[in-house]
Amino acid sequence: MSVRALARVNIAAIERNVRRLRRELASSVALCAVVKADGYGHGALPAARAALAGGARWLAVVAATEAATLRTGGIDAPILVMGALSPGELDVALAARADVVGWDESFVDAVAARGGGAIHVKLDTGMGRLGTRDPAVATRVAEAAAIADGVRLAGAMTHFATADDRDDPFLHEQLARFVAWLGPLRDTHPQIVAHAANSAATLRDPATHFDLVRTGVAIYGLDPFGEDPLARELEPALELRSYVGAVKAVAPGESVGYGRSFVARRPTYVATLPIGYGDGVRRALTNNADVLVRGVRRPLVGTVSMDNVTLDVGAPPQAAVGDGAILIGEQGDERITAEELALRLDTINYEITCGLLPRVPRAYHRDGEDLS
Protein backbone atom coordinates (compact mmCIF):
# COMPACT_ATOMS: atom_id res chain seq x y z
CA MET A 1 0.00 0.00 0.00
CA SER A 2 1.15 3.53 -0.73
CA VAL A 3 -0.87 4.93 2.19
CA ARG A 4 -1.21 3.98 5.87
CA ALA A 5 -4.89 3.22 5.58
CA LEU A 6 -7.44 3.22 2.80
CA ALA A 7 -11.22 3.12 2.48
CA ARG A 8 -12.11 1.39 -0.78
CA VAL A 9 -15.63 2.02 -2.03
CA ASN A 10 -17.30 -0.18 -4.62
CA ILE A 11 -19.43 2.09 -6.79
CA ALA A 12 -21.15 -0.90 -8.38
CA ALA A 13 -22.34 -2.04 -4.94
CA ILE A 14 -24.11 1.29 -4.38
CA GLU A 15 -25.78 0.99 -7.78
CA ARG A 16 -26.95 -2.54 -6.98
CA ASN A 17 -28.22 -1.54 -3.54
CA VAL A 18 -30.34 1.20 -5.10
CA ARG A 19 -31.76 -1.26 -7.62
CA ARG A 20 -32.48 -3.71 -4.80
CA LEU A 21 -34.34 -1.01 -2.83
CA ARG A 22 -36.29 0.00 -5.91
CA ARG A 23 -37.70 -3.53 -5.97
CA GLU A 24 -39.53 -2.63 -2.75
CA LEU A 25 -41.30 0.29 -4.43
CA ALA A 26 -44.19 0.72 -6.77
CA SER A 27 -43.16 2.15 -10.12
CA SER A 28 -44.81 5.45 -9.20
CA VAL A 29 -42.64 5.89 -6.09
CA ALA A 30 -39.35 7.74 -6.51
CA LEU A 31 -36.19 6.94 -4.56
CA CYS A 32 -34.25 9.79 -3.00
CA ALA A 33 -30.67 8.82 -2.13
CA VAL A 34 -29.44 10.52 1.04
CA VAL A 35 -25.80 11.54 0.61
CA LYS A 36 -25.37 13.82 3.64
CA ALA A 37 -22.23 13.67 5.80
CA ASP A 38 -20.08 13.05 2.73
CA GLY A 39 -22.23 10.14 1.70
CA TYR A 40 -22.13 8.54 5.17
CA GLY A 41 -18.34 8.56 4.87
CA HIS A 42 -18.29 7.00 1.40
CA GLY A 43 -17.84 10.24 -0.57
CA ALA A 44 -20.86 12.32 -1.51
CA LEU A 45 -20.18 12.90 -5.19
CA PRO A 46 -19.24 9.32 -6.13
CA ALA A 47 -22.14 8.00 -4.04
CA ALA A 48 -24.57 10.45 -5.65
CA ARG A 49 -23.49 9.50 -9.16
CA ALA A 50 -23.74 5.80 -8.36
CA ALA A 51 -27.17 6.18 -6.77
CA LEU A 52 -28.50 8.06 -9.78
CA ALA A 53 -27.05 5.42 -12.10
CA GLY A 54 -28.83 2.79 -10.01
CA GLY A 55 -32.22 4.45 -10.38
CA ALA A 56 -32.46 7.20 -7.74
CA ARG A 57 -34.32 10.27 -8.98
CA TRP A 58 -33.61 12.64 -6.09
CA LEU A 59 -30.72 13.36 -3.73
CA ALA A 60 -30.96 14.64 -0.17
CA VAL A 61 -28.47 16.37 2.09
CA VAL A 62 -28.70 18.32 5.34
CA ALA A 63 -26.34 21.26 4.80
CA ALA A 64 -26.61 23.88 2.09
CA THR A 65 -22.90 23.53 1.39
CA GLU A 66 -23.47 19.85 0.65
CA ALA A 67 -25.98 20.80 -2.04
CA ALA A 68 -23.51 23.31 -3.48
CA THR A 69 -20.81 20.63 -3.61
CA LEU A 70 -23.11 18.34 -5.58
CA ARG A 71 -23.95 21.09 -8.07
CA THR A 72 -20.30 22.05 -8.46
CA GLY A 73 -19.58 18.39 -9.14
CA GLY A 74 -21.96 18.38 -12.07
CA ILE A 75 -25.04 16.85 -10.45
CA ASP A 76 -28.24 18.10 -12.09
CA ALA A 77 -30.83 15.92 -10.29
CA PRO A 78 -33.32 17.41 -7.81
CA ILE A 79 -31.70 18.02 -4.42
CA LEU A 80 -33.51 18.41 -1.10
CA VAL A 81 -31.75 20.20 1.77
CA MET A 82 -33.39 18.73 4.87
CA GLY A 83 -31.72 20.73 7.64
CA ALA A 84 -32.45 24.00 9.40
CA LEU A 85 -30.96 26.92 7.48
CA SER A 86 -29.57 30.24 8.65
CA PRO A 87 -30.13 33.21 6.33
CA GLY A 88 -26.71 32.73 4.79
CA GLU A 89 -27.23 29.00 4.37
CA LEU A 90 -30.59 29.64 2.74
CA ASP A 91 -28.82 31.84 0.18
CA VAL A 92 -26.42 28.99 -0.61
CA ALA A 93 -29.20 26.40 -0.86
CA LEU A 94 -31.31 28.47 -3.22
CA ALA A 95 -28.28 29.37 -5.33
CA ALA A 96 -27.71 25.63 -5.71
CA ARG A 97 -31.28 25.25 -6.99
CA ALA A 98 -32.10 22.99 -4.06
CA ASP A 99 -35.52 22.42 -2.53
CA VAL A 100 -35.63 23.42 1.13
CA VAL A 101 -37.63 22.39 4.18
CA GLY A 102 -39.74 24.81 6.22
CA TRP A 103 -42.25 24.76 9.05
CA ASP A 104 -43.13 28.38 9.78
CA GLU A 105 -44.44 31.27 7.74
CA SER A 106 -41.38 33.45 8.34
CA PHE A 107 -39.34 30.90 6.41
CA VAL A 108 -41.71 31.19 3.47
CA ASP A 109 -41.25 34.96 3.60
CA ALA A 110 -37.46 34.52 3.63
CA VAL A 111 -37.56 32.30 0.56
CA ALA A 112 -39.84 34.73 -1.26
CA ALA A 113 -37.58 37.65 -0.37
CA ARG A 114 -34.71 35.86 -2.11
CA GLY A 115 -36.61 35.45 -5.34
CA GLY A 116 -38.38 32.23 -4.48
CA GLY A 117 -37.73 28.53 -4.37
CA ALA A 118 -39.35 25.17 -3.69
CA ILE A 119 -40.44 24.37 -0.12
CA HIS A 120 -41.31 21.07 1.52
CA VAL A 121 -43.38 21.60 4.67
CA LYS A 122 -42.41 19.39 7.61
CA LEU A 123 -44.85 18.10 10.21
CA ASP A 124 -43.20 16.80 13.38
CA THR A 125 -45.20 13.65 14.07
CA GLY A 126 -42.98 12.46 16.89
CA MET A 127 -39.28 12.87 16.11
CA GLY A 128 -39.19 16.01 18.22
CA ARG A 129 -36.48 17.86 16.30
CA LEU A 130 -37.40 19.88 13.21
CA GLY A 131 -40.88 20.69 11.96
CA THR A 132 -44.02 21.94 13.66
CA ARG A 133 -46.02 19.61 15.88
CA ASP A 134 -49.25 21.45 15.07
CA PRO A 135 -50.98 20.22 11.89
CA ALA A 136 -52.90 23.49 11.64
CA VAL A 137 -49.66 25.46 11.63
CA ALA A 138 -48.20 23.12 9.02
CA THR A 139 -51.24 23.69 6.83
CA ARG A 140 -50.95 27.47 7.19
CA VAL A 141 -47.29 27.27 6.17
CA ALA A 142 -48.24 25.19 3.14
CA GLU A 143 -50.94 27.65 2.13
CA ALA A 144 -48.52 30.54 2.53
CA ALA A 145 -45.98 28.76 0.33
CA ALA A 146 -48.63 28.08 -2.29
CA ILE A 147 -49.42 31.77 -2.78
CA ALA A 148 -46.09 33.50 -2.08
CA ASP A 149 -44.44 35.16 -5.07
CA GLY A 150 -41.82 32.91 -6.63
CA VAL A 151 -42.37 30.15 -4.07
CA ARG A 152 -43.55 26.68 -4.99
CA LEU A 153 -45.19 24.33 -2.50
CA ALA A 154 -43.27 21.23 -3.54
CA GLY A 155 -43.69 18.69 -0.78
CA ALA A 156 -45.04 17.53 2.56
CA MET A 157 -42.89 15.41 4.83
CA THR A 158 -42.19 13.91 8.22
CA HIS A 159 -39.50 11.69 9.74
CA PHE A 160 -39.85 8.49 11.75
CA ALA A 161 -38.18 8.06 15.14
CA THR A 162 -38.37 4.27 15.60
CA ALA A 163 -38.61 2.73 12.15
CA ASP A 164 -35.49 0.67 12.84
CA ASP A 165 -37.19 -1.07 15.79
CA ARG A 166 -39.62 -3.50 14.21
CA ASP A 167 -41.31 -4.23 17.54
CA ASP A 168 -42.07 -0.60 18.33
CA PRO A 169 -45.58 0.50 17.24
CA PHE A 170 -44.72 4.21 17.35
CA LEU A 171 -43.98 4.16 13.61
CA HIS A 172 -47.66 3.59 12.94
CA GLU A 173 -48.71 6.31 15.39
CA GLN A 174 -46.53 8.75 13.48
CA LEU A 175 -47.83 7.45 10.17
CA ALA A 176 -51.44 8.00 11.26
CA ARG A 177 -50.70 11.60 12.27
CA PHE A 178 -49.02 12.28 8.94
CA VAL A 179 -51.84 10.74 6.92
CA ALA A 180 -54.47 12.71 8.86
CA TRP A 181 -52.70 15.96 8.00
CA LEU A 182 -51.74 15.01 4.46
CA GLY A 183 -55.19 13.98 3.24
CA PRO A 184 -56.89 17.39 3.35
CA LEU A 185 -53.70 19.10 2.15
CA ARG A 186 -53.57 16.91 -0.94
CA ASP A 187 -57.21 17.63 -1.68
CA THR A 188 -56.20 21.26 -2.16
CA HIS A 189 -52.69 20.70 -3.50
CA PRO A 190 -52.63 17.37 -5.34
CA GLN A 191 -49.27 18.12 -6.96
CA ILE A 192 -47.22 17.97 -3.76
CA VAL A 193 -44.68 15.20 -3.24
CA ALA A 194 -45.36 13.38 0.04
CA HIS A 195 -42.47 11.59 1.73
CA ALA A 196 -41.73 10.07 5.10
CA ALA A 197 -39.82 6.78 4.84
CA ASN A 198 -36.16 6.33 5.68
CA SER A 199 -34.30 3.10 4.83
CA ALA A 200 -35.83 1.15 7.71
CA ALA A 201 -39.39 2.24 6.96
CA THR A 202 -38.88 1.56 3.26
CA LEU A 203 -38.03 -2.06 4.05
CA ARG A 204 -40.52 -2.41 6.89
CA ASP A 205 -43.87 -1.10 5.62
CA PRO A 206 -45.02 -0.10 2.11
CA ALA A 207 -47.67 2.14 3.69
CA THR A 208 -44.87 4.60 4.47
CA HIS A 209 -43.71 4.98 0.86
CA PHE A 210 -46.11 7.68 -0.44
CA ASP A 211 -44.56 9.42 -3.49
CA LEU A 212 -40.91 9.20 -2.51
CA VAL A 213 -38.66 7.38 -0.03
CA ARG A 214 -35.49 8.86 1.46
CA THR A 215 -33.03 5.98 1.69
CA GLY A 216 -29.64 6.67 3.20
CA VAL A 217 -27.86 3.93 5.09
CA ALA A 218 -29.17 1.07 2.95
CA ILE A 219 -27.81 2.41 -0.34
CA TYR A 220 -24.33 1.93 1.13
CA GLY A 221 -25.09 -1.68 1.97
CA LEU A 222 -25.49 -1.01 5.69
CA ASP A 223 -28.41 -2.71 7.36
CA PRO A 224 -30.92 -0.22 8.84
CA PHE A 225 -31.84 -2.71 11.56
CA GLY A 226 -28.21 -3.31 12.58
CA GLU A 227 -28.27 -6.91 11.40
CA ASP A 228 -26.41 -8.80 8.67
CA PRO A 229 -26.80 -6.77 5.46
CA LEU A 230 -26.52 -9.87 3.29
CA ALA A 231 -29.70 -11.25 4.85
CA ARG A 232 -31.55 -8.35 3.19
CA GLU A 233 -29.55 -8.61 -0.04
CA LEU A 234 -27.65 -5.44 0.76
CA GLU A 235 -24.03 -5.25 -0.32
CA PRO A 236 -21.60 -3.29 1.89
CA ALA A 237 -19.82 -0.83 -0.36
CA LEU A 238 -16.94 0.19 1.90
CA GLU A 239 -13.82 -1.73 2.88
CA LEU A 240 -11.34 -0.33 5.42
CA ARG A 241 -7.84 -1.67 5.07
CA SER A 242 -4.35 -1.09 6.44
CA TYR A 243 -1.20 -3.23 6.56
CA VAL A 244 1.24 -4.78 9.00
CA GLY A 245 3.96 -2.22 9.69
CA ALA A 246 5.93 -4.14 12.32
CA VAL A 247 5.98 -7.53 14.06
CA LYS A 248 7.73 -8.15 17.36
CA ALA A 249 7.99 -10.83 20.00
CA VAL A 250 6.27 -10.28 23.33
CA ALA A 251 7.28 -12.37 26.34
CA PRO A 252 5.00 -13.30 29.25
CA GLY A 253 4.63 -10.29 31.52
CA GLU A 254 5.48 -7.76 28.83
CA SER A 255 2.85 -5.22 27.86
CA VAL A 256 1.73 -3.48 24.70
CA GLY A 257 0.42 0.06 24.34
CA TYR A 258 -0.64 2.92 26.58
CA GLY A 259 -1.75 2.04 30.07
CA ARG A 260 -0.49 -1.56 29.76
CA SER A 261 -4.05 -2.67 29.01
CA PHE A 262 -2.63 -5.83 27.44
CA VAL A 263 -0.06 -7.92 29.28
CA ALA A 264 1.03 -11.14 27.58
CA ARG A 265 0.32 -14.36 29.46
CA ARG A 266 2.27 -16.50 27.00
CA PRO A 267 4.98 -15.97 24.42
CA THR A 268 3.42 -14.38 21.37
CA TYR A 269 4.00 -11.88 18.60
CA VAL A 270 2.27 -8.56 18.11
CA ALA A 271 1.70 -6.90 14.75
CA THR A 272 1.38 -3.12 14.61
CA LEU A 273 -0.87 -1.51 11.99
CA PRO A 274 -0.44 2.19 11.11
CA ILE A 275 -4.06 3.14 11.74
CA GLY A 276 -5.68 4.48 14.90
CA TYR A 277 -8.27 6.83 16.33
CA GLY A 278 -6.73 9.66 14.30
CA ASP A 279 -8.12 7.76 11.33
CA GLY A 280 -11.47 6.85 12.87
CA VAL A 281 -10.76 3.55 14.65
CA ARG A 282 -12.53 4.17 17.93
CA ARG A 283 -10.47 3.95 21.13
CA ALA A 284 -13.35 2.01 22.70
CA LEU A 285 -12.31 -0.93 20.49
CA THR A 286 -9.31 -1.43 22.79
CA ASN A 287 -9.09 -5.20 23.43
CA ASN A 288 -12.53 -5.39 21.80
CA ALA A 289 -12.22 -6.10 18.06
CA ASP A 290 -10.76 -8.40 15.44
CA VAL A 291 -8.82 -7.59 12.29
CA LEU A 292 -8.37 -9.90 9.32
CA VAL A 293 -4.80 -10.84 8.41
CA ARG A 294 -4.14 -13.68 5.97
CA GLY A 295 -7.86 -14.44 6.06
CA VAL A 296 -7.85 -15.11 9.82
CA ARG A 297 -9.34 -13.04 12.64
CA ARG A 298 -6.60 -11.63 14.84
CA PRO A 299 -7.62 -9.98 18.13
CA LEU A 300 -6.87 -6.33 18.64
CA VAL A 301 -4.82 -6.15 21.85
CA GLY A 302 -3.62 -3.12 23.75
CA THR A 303 -4.99 0.40 23.68
CA VAL A 304 -6.02 1.90 20.36
CA SER A 305 -3.74 4.90 19.97
CA MET A 306 -3.96 7.87 17.64
CA ASP A 307 -1.79 6.33 14.95
CA ASN A 308 -1.57 2.58 15.61
CA VAL A 309 -3.40 -0.54 16.65
CA THR A 310 -1.79 -3.81 17.67
CA LEU A 311 -2.85 -7.39 17.02
CA ASP A 312 -1.94 -10.68 18.65
CA VAL A 313 -0.73 -12.80 15.72
CA GLY A 314 0.39 -15.82 17.74
CA ALA A 315 3.64 -17.74 17.99
CA PRO A 316 5.18 -18.45 15.61
CA PRO A 317 3.87 -15.23 14.07
CA GLN A 318 1.10 -15.65 11.50
CA ALA A 319 1.83 -12.26 9.95
CA ALA A 320 4.72 -10.45 8.33
CA VAL A 321 5.55 -6.85 7.54
CA GLY A 322 3.59 -5.79 4.48
CA ASP A 323 0.66 -8.17 4.95
CA GLY A 324 -2.70 -6.59 4.20
CA ALA A 325 -5.11 -6.07 7.10
CA ILE A 326 -8.88 -5.66 6.83
CA LEU A 327 -10.74 -3.76 9.55
CA ILE A 328 -14.05 -3.66 7.64
CA GLY A 329 -14.63 -6.02 4.76
CA GLU A 330 -13.80 -9.51 3.56
CA GLN A 331 -10.59 -11.50 3.35
CA GLY A 332 -10.57 -15.18 2.55
CA ASP A 333 -13.67 -16.75 4.05
CA GLU A 334 -13.93 -14.21 6.87
CA ARG A 335 -15.91 -10.99 7.02
CA ILE A 336 -16.03 -8.05 9.44
CA THR A 337 -18.96 -5.67 9.03
CA ALA A 338 -19.70 -2.18 10.25
CA GLU A 339 -22.62 -3.79 12.07
CA GLU A 340 -20.21 -6.00 14.04
CA LEU A 341 -18.13 -3.01 15.09
CA ALA A 342 -21.26 -1.07 15.98
CA LEU A 343 -22.42 -3.91 18.21
CA ARG A 344 -19.07 -3.95 20.00
CA LEU A 345 -19.31 -0.19 20.52
CA ASP A 346 -23.01 -0.09 21.44
CA THR A 347 -23.71 2.27 18.57
CA ILE A 348 -25.06 2.14 15.01
CA ASN A 349 -23.39 1.23 11.75
CA TYR A 350 -23.86 4.78 10.40
CA GLU A 351 -21.49 6.11 13.04
CA ILE A 352 -18.78 3.65 12.03
CA THR A 353 -18.53 4.82 8.43
CA CYS A 354 -19.30 8.47 9.15
CA GLY A 355 -16.51 8.38 11.72
CA LEU A 356 -13.75 7.66 9.21
CA LEU A 357 -11.59 10.76 9.33
CA PRO A 358 -9.97 12.78 6.51
CA ARG A 359 -6.57 11.12 7.01
CA VAL A 360 -8.07 8.00 5.42
CA PRO A 361 -8.23 8.52 1.66
CA ARG A 362 -11.13 7.07 -0.29
CA ALA A 363 -10.45 5.05 -3.42
CA TYR A 364 -13.17 3.97 -5.82
CA HIS A 365 -13.55 0.83 -7.86
CA ARG A 366 -16.16 -1.06 -9.81
CA ASP A 367 -16.13 -4.68 -8.64
CA GLY A 368 -12.35 -4.58 -8.30
CA GLU A 369 -11.54 -2.43 -11.32
CA ASP A 370 -9.99 0.78 -10.02
CA LEU A 371 -11.54 4.06 -11.14
CA SER A 372 -9.42 7.13 -11.75
Question: At which residue positions do the language-model features occur?
Answer:
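Anionic-ligand-binding alpha/beta catalytic cores of soluble enzymes and soluble regulatory domains
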Residues: 167-269
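A structural signal for short, hydrophobic beta-strand segments that form beta-sheets
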Residues: 81, 153, 244, 300-301
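Active-site-proximal beta-alpha core segment in soluble small-molecule metabolic enzymes
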Residues: 5-8, 13-16, 27-196, 209
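C-terminal accessory subdomain/extension
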Residues: 249-372
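Solvent-exposed alpha-helices and their adjacent loops that cap or buttress functional pockets
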Residues: 25, 72, 92-93, 114, ...
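Conserved beta-strand segments that form the floor/walls of ligand-binding pockets within enzyme
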Residues: 34, 120-122, 155, 214, ...
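Gly-rich Lys/Arg/Thr-decorated short loops/hinges at beta-loop-alpha junctions or inter-strand turns
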Residues: 1-3
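Catalytic metal-binding/acid-base residues of hydrolase active sites
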Residues: 126, 161, 200, 218, ...
